[in-house]
């Protein structure tokens, strides 16, 4: 405190889990109302030891990218599958193929995740669906990786749908950018934490986390 010549503002960010809180505060004039040169953020991590501190230079949390895949096929009676195109079969092939993006299309040194979280149809017990909607969540720790995931996803959906003679579309939207720590400020925060907690309680090079914060 005695060596600090400045002002500290405490920012309590709303809606960080939905990745809109910081954007809203900035749009409402946070940095025009207050003369802020640097921002340091803290987040609890349940699997870290109580009283410990971790950070890293560069990317520390991933971008969050929500996607929606729609398949428009030709439904029909379950007893007459040859009279239509089973959208579930098409969607299932897409869901499995999407997992090859991370395992076969990304550099193994890169971090990425593709998860299908919903698979919705308009079928019934004895009716093959004509429409399938899949939604999901993709994470990446670089812009290049994110763009690769998006382009490969589109190629997979269009290719499989074309093979079955149906229409498919992808809506891929980045809802939260990745968090990238500045080098100098990260060093300052780590040194301060070591003074407070001790070197054995501080890790200045933790593994990046693929959850997302804004």
Feature-to-residue mapping (PLM):
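Histidine/acidic-residue-rich, glycine-tolerant segments that coordinate divalent metal ions
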Residues: 2-118, 123-127, 212-213
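Metal-dependent amide/peptide-bond hydrolase catalytic core
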Residues: 89-214
């Amino acid at each position: 405190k005695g060596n600090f010549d400045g002002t500290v503002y405490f920012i309590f960010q709303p809606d960080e889990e939905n990745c809109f809180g910081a954007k809203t505060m900035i749009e409402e004039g946070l940095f025009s109302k207050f003369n802020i040169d640097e921002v340091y953020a803290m987040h609890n991590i349940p699997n870290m030891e109580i009283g410990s501190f971790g950070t890293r230079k560069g990317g520390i949390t991933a971008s969050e990218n929500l996607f929606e895949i729609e398949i428009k096929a030709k439904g029909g009676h379950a007893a007459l599958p040859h009279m239509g195109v089973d959208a579930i079969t098409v969607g299932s092939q897409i869901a499995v193929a999407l997992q090859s993006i991370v395992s076969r299309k990304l550099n193994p040194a890169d971090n990425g995740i593709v998860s299908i979280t919903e698979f919705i149809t308009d079928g019934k017990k004895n009716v093959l669906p004509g429409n399938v909607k899949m939604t999901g969540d993709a994470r990446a720790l670089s812009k290049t990786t994110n763009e690769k995931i998006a382009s490969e996803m589109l190629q997979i959906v269009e290719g499989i749908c074309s093979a079955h003679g149906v229409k498919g579309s992808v809506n891929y939207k980045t809802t939260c950018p990745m968090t990238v720590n500045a080098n100098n400020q990260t060093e300052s925060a780590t040194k301060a934490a070591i003074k407070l907690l001790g070197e054995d309680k501080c890790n200045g090079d933790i593994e990046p986390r693929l959850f997302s914060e804004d």
